[in-house]
Swiss-Prot record:
Gene: hisE
Signal peptide: none
Location within or outside the cell: Cytoplasm
One Pfam family recorded for the sequence: PRA-PH
Catalytic function, reaction form: 1-(5-phospho-beta-D-ribosyl)-ATP + H2O = 1-(5-phospho-beta-D-ribosyl)-5'-AMP + diphosphate + H(+)
Family membership: Belongs to the PRA-PH family.
Organism: Pyrobaculum islandicum (strain DSM 4184 / JCM 9189 / GEO3)
Keywords carried by this UniProt record: Amino-acid biosynthesis, ATP-binding, Cytoplasm, Histidine biosynthesis, Hydrolase, Nucleotide-binding
InterPro entries in UniProt: HisE, PRib-ATP_PPHydrolase-like
Any single biological process term in GO: L-histidine biosynthetic process
PANTHER family to which the protein is assigned, alphabetical: HISTIDINE BIOSYNTHESIS BIFUNCTIONAL PROTEIN, HISTIDINE BIOSYNTHESIS BIFUNCTIONAL PROTEIN HIS7
Name of the featured protein: Phosphoribosyl-ATP pyrophosphatase
Transmembrane regions listed in the UniProt entry: none
Length: 94
């Protein structure tokens, strides 16, 4: 299974940040600063862990999707991309 949806999501995130629409959650999160974005990633990671320990599979999937979204916003906020992470994973597999 390909995860092309992550690349599409990354593009949507980039576009929403560029549009600077104050009604966009993505833009508001991004413009709140790296500390808030990082805090949100931490919160979502904890929610994935809690779901894994005490909730069903569907809840784990939902929380993991939230974590991936917020991680992509974090990467964008630091000038990185999903491609950078994929390159590192490929390097580690050698």
């Amino acid at each position: 299974m390909s995860c092309e949806i992550l690349r599409k999501l990354e593009e949507v995130i980039r576009r929403r940040i560029e549009e600077k629409n104050p009604e966009s959650y993505t833009y508001r999160l991004y413009s709140s600063g790296i500390h808030n974005v990082a805090r949100k990633v931490g919160e979502e990671a904890v929610e994935v862990a809690v779901a894994a320990l005490a909730e069903g599979k569907s809840r784990i999937v939902e929380e993991a999707a939230d974590l991936l979204y917020h991680l992509l916003v974090l990467l964008n906020s630091t000038g990185l991309s999903l491609g950078d992470v994929c390159a590192e994973l490929e390097r580690r597999m050698r």
